[in-house]
């Protein structure tokens, strides 16, 4: 099966491309990365930075996760990301997404050995 670290990479890493202003980016990527099977995932963020840079976030600023767990970390620098959001009225199997390129600090949950990202928690404008 797929490990949580592998799932994180499948759902959130797109190192090879820069943030796309193409309105079809999310429709293509959500399908390509198997997030429209059985249901449409409502919100998903892709990170356009080298994997090692995202893995390094696990050793940056420690923050509390949205669910109250304490294994989340915020990136020291802003990263290029694309936010995909299911459009209103979009119904499975016709999953349609809005595409928003952004530059933000990311917050990830990390676990395991090696200690790597396993969950994308949030993205924030500033470093506070």
From Swiss-Prot:
<dbReference type="InterPro" id="IPR023412">
    <property type="entry name" value="RNaseA_domain"/>
</dbReference>
<keyword id="KW-0378">Hydrolase</keyword>
<keyword id="KW-0456">Lyase</keyword>
<comment type="subunit">
    <text>Monomer. Interacts with and forms tight 1:1 complexes with RNH1. Dimerization of two such complexes may occur. Interaction with RNH1 inhibits this protein.</text>
</comment>
<dbReference type="InterPro" id="IPR023411">
    <property type="entry name" value="RNaseA_AS"/>
</dbReference>
<feature type="disulfide bond">
    <location>
        <begin position="40"/>
        <end position="95"/>
    </location>
</feature>
<keyword id="KW-0255">Endonuclease</keyword>
<feature type="active site" description="Proton acceptor">
    <location>
        <position position="12"/>
    </location>
</feature>
<dbReference type="InterPro" id="IPR036816">
    <property type="entry name" value="RNaseA-like_dom_sf"/>
</dbReference>
<keyword id="KW-0964">Secreted</keyword>
<feature type="compositionally biased region" description="Basic and acidic residues">
    <location>
        <begin position="1"/>
        <end position="13"/>
    </location>
</feature>
<dbReference type="GO" id="GO:0003676">
    <property type="term" value="F:nucleic acid binding"/>
</dbReference>
<dbReference type="InterPro" id="IPR001427">
    <property type="entry name" value="RNaseA"/>
</dbReference>
<dbReference type="GO" id="GO:0050830">
    <property type="term" value="P:defense response to Gram-positive bacterium"/>
</dbReference>
<comment type="similarity">
    <text>Belongs to the pancreatic ribonuclease family.</text>
</comment>
<dbReference type="GO" id="GO:0004522">
    <property type="term" value="F:ribonuclease A activity"/>
</dbReference>
<keyword id="KW-0325">Glycoprotein</keyword>
<feature type="active site" description="Proton donor">
    <location>
        <position position="119"/>
    </location>
</feature>
<feature type="region of interest" description="Disordered">
    <location>
        <begin position="1"/>
        <end position="24"/>
    </location>
</feature>
<feature type="disulfide bond">
    <location>
        <begin position="26"/>
        <end position="84"/>
    </location>
</feature>
<feature type="binding site">
    <location>
        <position position="85"/>
    </location>
    <ligand>
        <name>substrate</name>
    </ligand>
</feature>
<protein>
    <recommendedName>
        <fullName>Ribonuclease pancreatic</fullName>
        <ecNumber>4.6.1.18</ecNumber>
    </recommendedName>
</protein>
<feature type="disulfide bond">
    <location>
        <begin position="65"/>
        <end position="72"/>
    </location>
</feature>
<feature type="disulfide bond">
    <location>
        <begin position="58"/>
        <end position="110"/>
    </location>
</feature>
<dbReference type="Pfam" id="PF00074">
    <property type="entry name" value="RnaseA"/>
</dbReference>
<feature type="binding site">
    <location>
        <begin position="41"/>
        <end position="45"/>
    </location>
    <ligand>
        <name>substrate</name>
    </ligand>
</feature>
<feature type="binding site">
    <location>
        <position position="7"/>
    </location>
    <ligand>
        <name>substrate</name>
    </ligand>
</feature>
<keyword id="KW-0540">Nuclease</keyword>
<dbReference type="GO" id="GO:0005576">
    <property type="term" value="C:extracellular region"/>
</dbReference>
<dbReference type="GO" id="GO:0016829">
    <property type="term" value="F:lyase activity"/>
</dbReference>
<feature type="glycosylation site" description="N-linked (GlcNAc...) asparagine">
    <location>
        <position position="34"/>
    </location>
</feature>
<feature type="binding site">
    <location>
        <position position="10"/>
    </location>
    <ligand>
        <name>substrate</name>
    </ligand>
</feature>
<keyword id="KW-1015">Disulfide bond</keyword>
<comment type="function">
    <text>Endonuclease that catalyzes the cleavage of RNA on the 3' side of pyrimidine nucleotides. Acts on single-stranded and double-stranded RNA.</text>
</comment>
<feature type="binding site">
    <location>
        <position position="66"/>
    </location>
    <ligand>
        <name>substrate</name>
    </ligand>
</feature>
């Amino acid at each position: 099966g797929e490990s949580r670290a592998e799932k994180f990479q499948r759902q959130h890493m797109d190192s090879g491309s820069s943030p796309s202003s193409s309105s079809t980016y999310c429709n293509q990527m959500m399908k390509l990365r198997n997030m429209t099977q059985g249901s449409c995932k409502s919100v998903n963020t892709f990170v356009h930075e080298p994997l090692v840079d995202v893995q390094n976030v696990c050793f940056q600023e420690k923050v509390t996760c949205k669910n109250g767990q304490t294994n989340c970390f915020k990136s020291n620098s802003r990263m290029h990301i694309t936010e995909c959001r299911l459009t209103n009225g979009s119904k499975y199997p016709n999953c349609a997404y809005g595409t928003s390129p952004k530059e933000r600090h990311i917050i990830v949950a990390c676990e395991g050995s090696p200690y790597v990202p396993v969950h994308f928690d949030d993205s924030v404008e500033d470093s506070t």
